């Protein structure tokens, strides 16, 4: 039965989430050392380049998009930055020790620990206002089982947490990897060209790089996905999906499968 009420999490989960919110960098280093090799990172780099090549072929074979818009699409595709496994900078043991040098925690004073953490986190946020944007910074911890595409910097990221079985393994056959993490990679690449991502250019600037007719054609072709989702009904709550709100994820899902296949 759907009630909308969230059950209280068990104490161990609360403690784990609380610790991870502060010590994500140290925990991430330990997780990577145990589960993710340099060879796996190189393998993933090859997969991403292969899927980008497939997406380029899809653009080339496209019959409804003008050459001017295709040219911009090629530039954006080529400029997509990839982040794999873990940060490439500020992730050594010395870097992490320096990062936490002011975090003097006590196992007997949880409240004081939280106050100190909030103080240091707020200070870090304030100081960052006077610093240039660090495009090497990650939006996820290395152990998270997730992936993302960022429109504002035109990048895709795959933490080490998702680069594990059953999504990915160097011991898998290529067909298994492309059928699992390959679809996820293609999904994130496609996000750069969905209803929202397509509004940003190769540098992550909000700019219309589409010819008007091409944009109209794109909207017409995504309508079938909108309609398909709008016809999906959940009888238990007497509601249907909002086809417009879900189109970005559905376009990315379809694109990911096509690229990976």
Predicted regions and their residues:
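Catalytic nucleotidyl-transfer cores of nucleotide-processing enzymes
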Residues: 1-6, 11
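Intrinsically disordered, low-complexity linker/terminal regions across diverse proteins
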Residues: 9, 13-16, 20-261
């Amino acid at each position: 039965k759907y009630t909308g009420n969230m059950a209280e999490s068990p104490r161990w989960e609360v403690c784990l989430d609380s610790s991870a919110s502060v010590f994500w960098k140290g925990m991430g280093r330990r997780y990577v050392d145990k589960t993710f090799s340099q060879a796996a990172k190189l393998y993933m780099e090859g997969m991403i380049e292969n899927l980008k090549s497939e997406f380029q072929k899809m653009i080339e074979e496209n019959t409804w998009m003008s050459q001017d818009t295709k040219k911009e699409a090629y530039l954006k595709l080529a400029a997509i930055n990839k982040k794999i496994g873990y940060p490439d900078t500020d992730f050594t043991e010395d870097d992490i020790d320096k990062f936490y040098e002011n975090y003097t925690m006590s196992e007997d004073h949880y409240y004081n620990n939280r106050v100190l953490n909030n103080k240091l986190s707020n200070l870090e946020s304030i100081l960052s206002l006077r610093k240039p944007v660090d495009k090497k910074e990650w939006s996820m911890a290395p152990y998270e089982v997730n992936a993302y595409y960022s429109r504002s910097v035109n990048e895709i990221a795959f933490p080490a947490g998702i680069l594990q079985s059953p999504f990915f393994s160097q011991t898998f056959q290529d067909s298994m990897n492309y059928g699992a993490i390959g679809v996820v990679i293609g999904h994130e690449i496609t996000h750069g060209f969905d209803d929202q991502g397509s509004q940003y250019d190769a540098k992550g600037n909000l700019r219309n790089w589409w010819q008007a007719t091409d944009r109209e054609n794109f909207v017409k072709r995504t309508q079938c996905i909108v309609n398909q989702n709008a016809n999906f009904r959940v009888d238990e709550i007497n509601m249907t999906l909002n086809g417009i709100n879900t189109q970005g994820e559905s376009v990315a899902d379809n694109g990911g499968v096509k690229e990976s296949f």
